[in-house]
Amino acid sequence: MPEHQQPELPHASAAGANGAATDMVITRNLDGSMKESAPPATVPAQSPLPLPASAVIVDTSASPHAAHRPVPVGNVRLSDAFLAPRLRINRETTIPSQYAHLEETNRLRNFRRAAGEFDGPFEGIYFNDSDVYKWLEAAAWAIAANPDDREDDLTAMIDAVIGLIEGAQDETGYVNTYFSVDLVGERWSDLRNKNELYCAGHLIQAAIAHHRATGSDRLLNVATRFADLICDTFGPVAEGKREQTDGHEEIELALIELYRTTGERRYLDQARYFLDIRGTGTIGGDAYH
């Protein structure tokens, strides 16, 4: 390697003005200047894959105060010898193995129990549902980055998990397997410690990812029903609501992104309420949290 250069950075391609992908390797010299060159001949050329226009992780396209605009997942393609194989292994091996772990640890069985398909105790810790939702979000973005593989086993896994969540949602829109069956009366009783709104936030984020990656409203419908219940439940006492906020932040950013996805203003207002009520009238203690 020439002594005046640092190691090559991973190279990527981005869609240009005409929609074509332009590959480049970016090298940073010691003086801080950047050099662009063609990728190594060993990297096979690929065509960019079409994705829904809204396949962005955070959508600030209609946010007037946002300084940056996101790039859709399909507009950037890593093709280097380091990160690209990692993404492929994540897609083909890691995410499917995590699905198996969700089964082995009975996280998925908890949803079957909530749906009345299994008679037995809840297993695991009270925030286990969030692990299922985090897996769904990761799997959805993996599908978004590989739309030609949407009919493979990973898609079937996603659909199966969504079916379990649909079955676990009750008639009010509530979804949380820990507070189902024998603990229904304890819902919203320990927001500081039991992560109910935290789990709800991860469900919403998983639903948004799935919707943006596939165009399907299936999980999004579950999430909006739950979000509507949350909006109807939490707010000023004068409105007959619970004047509380969560102990573990998460629901706020999820509701903001749900607003960006649906255009439903009440989700943005609810996120603002949760932020404004935190710490009101106190500098510590349970009321602060």
What feature does the model see in each segment?
Residues 2-289:
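Glycan-recognition and catalytic cores of secretory/periplasmic carbohydrate-active enzymes
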